[in-house]
Amino acid sequence: MAKLTQANEDYLEAIVMLAGADRLPVRSVDLASRLGVSKPSVNKAVTLLKEEGFIEQQPYGDIFLTDAGAAYGEAVLERHNTLTRFFTEVLGVKADIAENEACCIEHVISEDTFQRWTEHIRQSLDCCPAK
């Protein structure tokens, strides 16, 4: 599976959020609104994501996640949510700062490092409950 740029991971993550668990179709206009970008920017990203096999779309139609796209996007979203929760709930970082920093880190942390980190946190919290 190809490694996407940070921007394209953001598009895929947003598609996953908009599609929801039922993988509903996503409209380009909703994607543009969610990310605060122009429709031409969405079209460019959608073209690349189609070429990489992460989404399907008929000309000017709704966007559908492929299995590969859902897996990749859900992994990015999981990293984002886990990092955000760690920053806010464990470290006490303000929500807006935690959100921004999680968005930066989610794109550069490897899957291996993320899995090892989450396992370490789980073990640390299980063995050392808050007083």
List each model region and its residues.
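C-terminal regulatory/oligomerization modules of transcriptional regulators
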Residues: 100-131
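Helix-turn-helix DNA-binding elements, focusing on the entry/boundary residues of the two helices
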Residues: 28, 46, 84
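Basic amphipathic alpha-helical segments that dock to polyanions
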Residues: 11, 31, 42-52
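Basic, amphipathic "hinge/linker" alpha-helix immediately C-terminal to the N-terminal HTH DNA-binding motif
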Residues: 61-80
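Key DNA-contact positions within bacterial/archaeal DNA-binding proteins
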Residues: 40, 96
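N-terminal helix-turn-helix DNA-binding core of bacterial DNA-binding proteins
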Residues: 2-37
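A short, conserved structural fragment
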Residues: 50-60
